[in-house]
Amino acid sequence: MMQGILIVDKPMDWTSFDVVAKLRGVLGTRKLGHSGTLDPMATGVLPVFCGGASKAVDLQLNHDKTYRATLRLGARTDSGDSTGTVLETAPVTAGEKELLAVLPQFIGPQMQVPPMYSAVKINGQPLYKLAREGVTVERKARPIEIYGIEYGGSPAENEYVLTVRCSKGTYIRTLLEEIATAMGQKGTMSALRRTAAGLYTEADAHTLEEILAAKEQGRAALEALMLPVESVFTPLPLLVVEPWVEQHLYNGCPTSRYPAADGRYRVRNAAGQFLGLANITGGVLRVEKLFVERN
């Protein structure tokens, strides 16, 4: 079974689940997981964890995201983006000057109410299903953080491109609506592309067409597109262990008086093979998660 991380450039009009379902057929395995759901209208970086690498989805060190989004002024929709039904229109009376003036107030930690058209669940029911039935319910605001917003110009009348660096759980649709409101305008998101997810960027991503072409060339070509699972953990210090310590890790046995500082480590064996994660506390080395089978 292939193991690694395949960074997909998600096409427009595909759900994240559509991409995973397609890759199950391409890779010949159901053991896949993805990180960071993208709306169907969005494109861009979607990390897909294959085989044993799927165990790393919940262990990622960096969940921050970067998006390139387009704000369109003049109308507000029920979904917060241009795929939704227009609820309200208004003449546009503000532009670039007003936009640049309000952006600084959106930088930093803040609370954000999830949109009705989202996968957040209330009493086990996804909000988007309630929204499709015309039902609106109260949602609790959640903590998010906007690290930076860069202005990228105006590609068309009343449209403005923004690059947003933010924490996990940020809804860009909601952010753009709030920016429009601060400008005294009605607004909606007309385009969205994720350019980075955690440690991975557009430069790491492959289109579905490229992945399908690699499949035609054989297993080696597919594996060449994948990043090693260790890439998720590169911010952690590296610990290279002796063979007897490696066996302790396989057996789940702690190693006492280990000569290294306390902390969390990514671990390789003497041959350079990535084994997994381990923690040292009080000089005792303990395995956290293994990504290899026992020898």
Describe every region a protein language model picked out.
Residues 1-13, 17-34, 38, 42, ...:
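Accessory RNA 3′-end/elbow-binding domains used by RNA modification enzymes
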